[in-house]
């Protein structure tokens, strides 16, 4: 998958699940299952419920995504 194909959206973490997986509610109300990107995992960036995050969705599966940034 090329970098150009991703869809970037903002959302709010509503639930933390095992194995660095989170349920994120997007701005339009959809709920997506997301995991943390590798760079965030390497740098031990903690994500808690209530945090605003930027996620990437693929055009193939719009119900799973990758968290790439945690807003301050």
UniProtKB/Swiss-Prot annotation:
Keywords per UniProt: Cytoplasm, Initiation factor, Protein biosynthesis, RNA-binding, rRNA-binding
Disulphide bond pairs: none
Pfam assignment, any one: eIF-1a
Domain of life: Bacteria
Record flagged with keyword Secreted: no
Cellular compartments per GO CC: cytosol
Subcellular location(s) per record: Cytoplasm
Gene3D superfamilies linked to this entry: Nucleic acid-binding proteins
Chief location category: cytoplasm
InterPro entries tied to this protein: NA-bd_OB-fold, RNA-binding_domain_S1_IF1, S1_domain, TIF_IF1
Molecular-function annotations in GO: ribosome binding; rRNA binding; translation initiation factor activity
Domain called S1-like: residue spans: 1-72
Subunit and interaction comment: Component of the 30S ribosomal translation pre-initiation complex which assembles on the 30S ribosome in the order IF-2 and IF-3, IF-1 and N-formylmethionyl-tRNA(fMet); mRNA recruitment can occur at any time during PIC assembly.
Role description: One of the essential components for the initiation of protein synthesis. Stabilizes the binding of IF-2 and IF-3 on the 30S subunit to which N-formylmethionyl-tRNA(fMet) subsequently binds. Helps modulate mRNA selection, yielding the 30S pre-initiation complex (PIC). Upon addition of the 50S ribosomal subunit IF-1, IF-2 and IF-3 are released leaving the mature 70S translation initiation complex.
Entry's family note: Belongs to the IF-1 family.
Protein name stated in the entry: Translation initiation factor IF-1
